[in-house]
């Protein structure tokens, strides 16, 4: 059927010309020119797709002859048919019939060689779109490769890729190798569909010339493939195809971004560029707040972000991670080589922690080094290797274990290189011999090797490291650090006895409590006893699990935590009915578990492992059950201690309160121009996080691979939990929120709550009221509550704990009012509060929230801390002030001075005075620690929120009580300055920048800059003469949580970054040198890769890295989002009035600093891929920022910054995004990518524009293909 464009008469003329040429054997060129004139006179647009289809259809196979091929080739040469369309028409006809017609196959490849590499004429031709659509209709490329947009550039890419693929399959088929491929057959037609007996007979009767031609054809096909791979245009097109084509038969190649030398940032592997890891480690060691997020997950994302941004190998990334973890331990004056032996050999008892107080101890620091860090590494390796799970899930041999990716090899190399840091791993000479024997025993135990002669003298600790790592790698636990195996020598026999079935005698139990388990099997054995053993055995297991295995069993710590959380939620019996909770029957067992996990270090360890939401979900049912019943039943523990439901409830409830900032003063919510950044932790929030994690876990290949590490004997319920399931807890929380937000509602006389309040007041002030009755009138407006000294209220107070908590705010209000009016003395008030807290320790939470809210409301007159009515700070207040000044000396921050009569006139708000007076009545021991750690952070934040010098006064009172805590308390007090003074925060940030960059050294340490200058010797390092000056980074880590409005930090950090860049340029680039670098031979304005700029660029990257870390640590995801959406666009729009200093180098360096700052901040918050939960927010914010960028480039937005800064920022940002975070580009709107690429081309950034399009996926693949052709044509 004739093409529609041709009239019948014209069609007949063309047919006649073809037949005449074949019959008369005319010159093909003469025939082609004559045909061109005929078509032109008929008004046919050339080249003509319809003519190409007609010619190919006419020739194959009825008129197939050598002359026909010559006519076709000349038709292409004189441009009357599109070359690529002819090739597309020939491919499905010739290649499948190559064995029947080897000559045709040869001629087809000759046409490929001549015309398959010329794309520019096609792209510029007016019929480009029509031609490519015709090719798609013929070869069905859109359907084959999933090209949805059907852009001509995308079809062109698919066509080139299909040609190479067809040639490759044909060559493999000729050599009999096609069956060895994964699909066993070609994706394309490789044999004729109309093969008949004649064809087979002809195939059998091939002569030697025929065979030789086939062999020559195979050789030519391979040469053509090689040419496609070497040609400048087609090689880039093929690379683009392999990067974006979604097909199981196309292996995705690694992405290598092509970035112009004028726009690529100078990336270095300087160790200082890993500084964010050190800051992160210090930040997670702050124990004042339990984090709902997992430190392991956050560290995983951080390391991946830095590895991508620094363009380093995984070996360098993991080595930097290990060294940062080691520095964390050493900054706390804990020598790692001592710490292991401290718990093993008990010979270094003289070693002491650097600072005493309610702060993380040795075990927590080692948890970061030996548990959190290895788990983060395991996550990274599992992400890489999880891609093989689905492919080998049906394999009985678990072949995935044999596939080692780059991450795993990088880990092994980094561990091997740690041997260069022998000083960190070598024990003191005094214990060298014992240490070597310990190392040998550890190797023998882990490896299962026995030594017949018992001699270990020739084994060293370094060998222990190597042996342990090899063994643990083979088991794929990935939890072995260089010296982890050493602690396993401690009383290994006690765990061996358990595994052999020995009963848990008291002596064996004590040994197991103090000796960490060495394997998951041992913990599973304990779990089995806890679920099936007797009551005494269950209690023994609870003590064992909360002992050394939890605190120092770093290789199995994550498993112990999960087992404990699971045991806190025992399943209900099948025959349970009614409202009675089955948890009551497990009271002694649960109490031991709850007490065991209450220490500061333990809660911190749970937080580091991200188990806080799961723990909250386990604690809420316990609180609901034990708080709802009357305490008529008591239980006796094996220690002889008598407990009631109130005791179990108080322990569980105070532990639950510590999991979020329940004491957060309302002041932090109502002051400032903006609300607090990020979600405010609450019971609902913790349950939401728990439900989401459990619902999502196990659905991704990475999670399924991670589950291989976990125990199979436990099955955690994934059913969602909501607050509605706990009505009494929900009622208390609603009252708690009301108490924090407003004054108490009126209490009705004669109500049940009124009677409970009366009974509690009678109990609290029984001694004070022996002389008669006393009226305590609360300020809330409730009726007068009378207490009588003669009433015995003990029977009346056998009430559910929730009922007592409901009445507690009214009790406190009445007591505080009575004290304010003089009806109660301060000492009597403190004594009464202590009686209430002893009766039900859970009321401490109510005291904290009530007193905090009352201080915030400011309705109470201050009281004089004169030593008569209230305790006096006079003994050491001046000393405390001096030491605060000493701590802040390096920052240049001014400390408010007390007036001359300040000591004698020291006052505190009445609620704060009552709370601090209560706390100093406690005796510090293990029994009260779990309750004081609830009050301590609240007291600290409450005092910090009050005017100066409330915090020094509180600190003075506590240092008088606990002198060994003085360093901790004074350091905490120094943070108050930053809570009240925004300028002090800015000065501290400035100190962080100048000290890290070594710009204005205030000490020999600061002159070198880097991590050591920023973080110094850690928190509270002590020398002779008391606590030392705090390094600015450590101080900022400790104070940023108390900054009321963190939104201003983005602008200040940005300003400090710009100032630092100017200082760097002034110091590193003299004006004369800068002028010489203004023009480089490649035509770009600035030469980033020049040697003269390398040092400056390293410092600029370090400054940007510091700034990004501070933004992320200070405000998390929301603050980074504000930086990208608001702060940066506002900065570029604003006029800064800067001069073109140093030949324009300062503006350029500022642009690159901003680019790295923006990319790194975003990578910290969102992650570099989609595995990070926060990555769901990334596309919207990134689109807004790129839309702003494109609009400014198109002239729709006027900029106020230096043009060189803007140009450097745009090219730098795009370069880093394409090279380091290519996954981001795939999430951006295709049209924005195309517009941005077009603007970059206008700046002569052709390669960068191309790299951006190449990273844009299928949506920009067509535009990238066309740009490849145009760019190569220009060159």
From Swiss-Prot:
Q: Does the keyword Transmembrane apply?
A: no
Keyword Cell inner membrane assigned to the entry: answer is no
Tell me where it resides: Nucleus
Free-text disruption phenotype from the record: No visible phenotype.
User: Where does the signal peptide begin and end?
Assistant: none
Q: Which UniProt keywords apply?
A: Nucleus, Phenylpropanoid metabolism, Repressor, Transcription, Transcription regulation
A single cellular component GO annotation: mediator complex
The cysteines covalently paired via disulfide bonds are none
Please tell me, according to the UniProt entry, what happens when changing residue 601 to N.
In ref4-1; Semidominant dwarfing and decreased accumulation of phenylpropanoids
Q: Where does the protein principally reside?
A: nucleus
- Annotated region (Disordered) at 772-792
Superkingdom = Eukaryota
Skewed-composition ranges (Low complexity): 772-791
Q: In which tissues is it expressed?
A: Ubiquitous.
**GO:BP terms for this protein?**
phenylpropanoid metabolic process; regulation of phenylpropanoid metabolic process
Assembly = Component of the Mediator complex.
**Which family is annotated?**
Belongs to the Mediator complex subunit 33 family.
Q: What does this protein do?
A: Component of the Mediator complex, a coactivator involved in the regulated transcription of nearly all RNA polymerase II-dependent genes. Mediator functions as a bridge to convey information from gene-specific regulatory proteins to the basal RNA polymerase II transcription machinery. The Mediator complex, having a compact conformation in its free form, is recruited to promoters by direct interactions with regulatory proteins and serves for the assembly of a functional preinitiation complex with RNA polymerase II and the general transcription factors.
Q: What is this protein called?
A: Mediator of RNA polymerase II transcription subunit 33B
């Amino acid at each position: 059927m004739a093409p529609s464009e041709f009239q019948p008469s014209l069609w007949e003329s063309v047919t006649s010309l073809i037949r005449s040429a074949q019959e008369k054997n005319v010159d093909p060129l003469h025939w082609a020119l004559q045909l061109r004139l005929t078509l032109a006179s008929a008004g046919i647009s050339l080249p003509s797709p319809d003519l190409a289809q007609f010619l190919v259809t006419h020739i194959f196979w009825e008129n197939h002859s050598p002359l026909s091929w010559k006519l076709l080739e000349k038709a292409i040469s004189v441009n009357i048919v599109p070359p690529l369309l002819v090739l597309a028409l020939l491919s499905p006809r010739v290649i499948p019939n190559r064995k029947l017609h080897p000559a045709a196959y040869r001629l087809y490849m000759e046409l490929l060689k001549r015309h398959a590499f010329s794309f520019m004429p096609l792209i510029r031709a007016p019929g480009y779109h029509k031609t490519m659509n015709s090719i798609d209709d013929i070869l069905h490329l859109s359907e084959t490769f999933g090209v949805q947009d059907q852009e001509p550039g995308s079809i062109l890419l698919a066509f080139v890729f299909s040609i190479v693929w067809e040639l490759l399959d044909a060559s493999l088929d000729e050599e009999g190798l096609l069956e060895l491929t994964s699909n066993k057959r070609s994706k394309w037609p490789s044999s004729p569909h109309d093969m008949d007996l004649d064809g087979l007979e002809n195939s059998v009767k091939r002569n030697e010339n025929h065979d030789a031609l086939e062999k020559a054809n195979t050789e030519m096909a391979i040469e053509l493939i090689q040419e496609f791979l070497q040609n400048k245009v087609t090689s880039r097109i093929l690379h683009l195809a392999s990067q974006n084509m979604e097909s199981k038969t196309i292996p995705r190649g690694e992405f290598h971004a092509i970035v112009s030398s004028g726009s690529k940032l100078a990336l270095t592997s300087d160790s200082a560029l890993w500084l964010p890891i050190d800051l992160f480690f210090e930040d997670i060691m702050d124990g004042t707040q339990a984090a709902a997020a997992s430190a392991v997950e956050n560290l995983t994302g951080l390391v991946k972000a830095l590895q991508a941004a620094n363009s380093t190998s995984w070996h360098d990334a993991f080595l930097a991670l290990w060294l940062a973890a080691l520095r964390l331990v050493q900054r706390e004056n804990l020598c790692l080589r001592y710490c292991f032996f401290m718990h093993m050999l008990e010979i270094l008892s003289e070693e002491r922690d650097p600072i005493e107080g309610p702060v993380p101890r040795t075990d927590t620091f080692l948890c970061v080094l030996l548990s959190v860090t290895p788990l983060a590494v395991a996550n990274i390796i599992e992400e890489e290797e999880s891609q093989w799970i689905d492919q080998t899930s049906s394999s009985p041999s678990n072949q995935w274990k044999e596939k080692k990716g780059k991450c795993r090899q990088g880990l092994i190399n980094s561990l091997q290189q740690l041997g260069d840091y022998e000083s960190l791993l070598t024990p003191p000479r005094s214990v060298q011999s014992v240490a070597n024997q310990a190392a040998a025993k550890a190797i023998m135990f882990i490896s299962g090797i026995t030594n017949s002669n018992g001699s270990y003298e020739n084994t060293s600790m370094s060998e222990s490291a190597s042996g342990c790592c090899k063994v643990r790698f083979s088991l794929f636990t990935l939890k072995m650090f260089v010296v982890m195996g050493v602690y396993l020598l401690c009383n290994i026999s006690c765990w061996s006895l358990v595994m052999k079935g020995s009963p848990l005698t008291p002596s064996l139990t004590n040994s197991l409590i103090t000796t960490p388990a060495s394997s998951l099997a041992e913990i599973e054995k304990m779990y089995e006893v806890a679920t099936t053993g007797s009551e005494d055995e269950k209690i023994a297991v609870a003590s064992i699990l909360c002992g050394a295995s939890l605190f120092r069993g770093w290789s199995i710590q994550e498993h112990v935590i999960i087992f404990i959380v699971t045991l806190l939620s025992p399943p209900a019996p099948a025959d349970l009915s009614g409202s009675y909770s089955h948890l009551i029957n497990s009271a002694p067992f649960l109490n031991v578990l709850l007490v065991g996990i209450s220490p500061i270090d333990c809660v911190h360890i749970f937080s580091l492992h991200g188990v806080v939401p799961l723990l909250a979900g386990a604690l809420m049912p316990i609180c609901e059950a034990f708080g709802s019943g009357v305490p008529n039943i008591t239980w006796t523990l094996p220690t002889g201690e008598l407990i009631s439901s109130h005791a179990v409830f108080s322990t569980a409830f105070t532990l639950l309160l510590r999991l979020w900032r329940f004491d957060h003063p309302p002041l932090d919510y109502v002051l400032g121009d903006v609300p607090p950044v990020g979600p405010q932790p609450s019971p609902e929030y913790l349950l939401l996080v728990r439900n989401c994690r459990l619902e999502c876990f196990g659905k991704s290949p990475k999670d399924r691979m991670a589950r291989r590490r976990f125990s199979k004997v436990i099955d955690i319920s994934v059913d969602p939990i909501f607050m509605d399931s706990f009505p009494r807890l929900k009622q208390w929380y609603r009252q708690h929120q009301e108490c924090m937000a407003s004054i108490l509602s009126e209490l009705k006389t004669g109500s049940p709550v009124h009677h409970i309040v009366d009974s509690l007041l009678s109990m609290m002030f029984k001694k004070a009221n022996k002389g008669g009755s006393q009226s305590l009138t609360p300020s809330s407006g409730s009726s007068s509550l009378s207490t009588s000294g003669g009433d015995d209220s003990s029977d009346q107070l056998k009430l559910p704990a929730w009922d007592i908590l409901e009445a507690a705010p009214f009790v406190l209000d009445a007591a505080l009012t009575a004290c304010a009016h003089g009806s109660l003395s301060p000492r009597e008030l403190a004594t009464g509060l202590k009686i209430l807290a002893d009766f039900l320790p859970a009321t401490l939470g109510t005291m904290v929230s009530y007193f905090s809210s009352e201080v915030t409301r400011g309705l109470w007159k201050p009281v004089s801390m004169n030593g008569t009515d209230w305790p006096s700070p006079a003994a050491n207040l001046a000393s405390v002030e001096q030491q605060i000044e000493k701590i802040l000396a390096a920052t240049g921050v001014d400390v408010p001075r007390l007036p001359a009569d300040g000591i004698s006139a020291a006052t505190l708000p009445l609620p704060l005075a009552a709370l601090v007076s209560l706390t100093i009545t406690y005796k510090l021991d293990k029994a009260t620690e779990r309750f004081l750690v609830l009050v301590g952070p609240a007291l600290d934040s409450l005092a910090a929120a009050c005017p100066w010098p409330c915090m020094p006064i509180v600190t003075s009172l506590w240092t008088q009580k606990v002198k060994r805590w003085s360093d901790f308390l004074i350091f905490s007090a120094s943070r108050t300055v930053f809570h009240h003074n925004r300028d002090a925060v800015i000065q501290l940030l400035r100190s962080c920048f100048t000290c890290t960059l070594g710009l204005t050294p205030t000490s020999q340490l600061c002159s070198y800059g880097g991590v050591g200058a920023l973080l110094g010797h850690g928190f509270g390092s002590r020398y002779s003469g008391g606590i030392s000056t705090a390094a600015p980074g450590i101080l900022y880590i400790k104070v940023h949580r108390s900054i009321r409005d963190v939104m201003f930090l983005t602008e200040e950090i940005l300003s400090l970054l710009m100032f630092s860049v100017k200082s760097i340029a002034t110091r590193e680039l003299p004006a004369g040198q800068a002028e010489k670098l203004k023009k480089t031979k490649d035509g770009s304005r600035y030469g980033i890769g020049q040697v003269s700029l390398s040092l400056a660029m390293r410092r600029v990257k370090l400054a940007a890295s510091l700034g990004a870390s501070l933004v992320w640590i200070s405000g998390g995801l929301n603050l980074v989002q504000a930086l990208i959406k608001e702060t940066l666009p506002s900065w570029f729009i604003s006029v800064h009035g800067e001069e073109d200093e140093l030949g324009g180098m300062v503006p350029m360096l500022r642009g690159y600093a901003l680019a790295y700052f923006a990319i790194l901040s975003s990578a910290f918050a969102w992650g570099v891929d989609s595995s990070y939960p926060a990555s769901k927010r990334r596309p919207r914010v990134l689109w807004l920022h790129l839309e702003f960028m494109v609009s400014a480039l198109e002239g729709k937005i006027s900029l106020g910054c230096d043009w060189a800064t803007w140009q450097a920022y745009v090219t730098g940002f795009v370069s880093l995004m394409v090279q380091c975070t290519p996954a981001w580009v795939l999430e951006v709107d295709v049209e924005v990518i195309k517009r941005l690429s077009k603007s970059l081309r206008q700046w002569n950034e052709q390669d960068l524009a191309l790299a951006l399009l190449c990273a844009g996926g299928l949506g920009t693949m067509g535009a990238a293909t066309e740009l490849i052709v145009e760019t190569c044509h220009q060159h």
